[in-house]
Amino acid sequence: MKKILLFLFLILGVYSFSAPSYVDLNKIQRDGYQIDVNDVDTLAFSQEESDMNLVVTMYFTNDGNPQTLRIAFKTMFAPAFGLEYTDEFQTNRAYIQKSFGENRNGIIYGYNIVPKNQKRKGCFLNVFLITEQELPDELLKDIGNTALDEVESYIK
C-alpha cells in the first residue's frame, strides 16, 4: 500500500510540473518534435530539418504579452546566441523579427515569430526559425502563418 501511495504521489508530482493539460504533448511528439523543456511555466520543443530548424517556446503566465517577447528577443535572446537583430515587420497575424549571425558553416539567419493574439489566455507563443538562407518578407509571411497554424493546433 505504501508503494502504491508513493507511486501516485510521484506521478502527481510529475504532472504538476509539466505543461498544462490543454497542450497536446503526444501530438507534438508524433509530429516529429523533440521536447526540450517541459516545466510549470515553459514548454520548448524543436525540430531539425536539412534546410531549416524550428524552435517553439510556449510560456504559461498571465503576466506576459507579445511586446515583452519582442523586446526580450531584441535585447536578450538574439545577443545571447550571437545573433544581431536587424529588422522587424508585421503581418495581420504576427510580428516577425529578423537577425543574423555566423557559425562554423557560415552566415545563419534567424526569424522570430510572435503572434499578435494568443489562442488561449495565459499561453504565449514564440516560434524561432533558423536557416542558412535569407528569406524574403513575403515568404516569411507564409512560413509564419503555416508555423503558427501548426503550433496553435497543439493547444486545445
Model-derived regions, located:
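Short, surface-exposed coil-to-beta transition loops
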Residues: 38-40, 52-55, 103-112, 122-124
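N-terminal "mature-domain start" segment
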Residues: 17-47, 79-88, 146-151
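Signature of long, low-cysteine stretches enriched in small and polar/charged residues
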Residues: 79-119
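A short acidic-to-branched-hydrophobic micro-motif
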Residues: 46-75, 123-130
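Sec-dependent N-terminal signal peptides
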Residues: 4-14
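Localized chelating/binding microdomains
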Residues: 18, 60, 71-73, 149, ...
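Surface-exposed amphipathic alpha-helical segments
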Residues: 33, 127-156
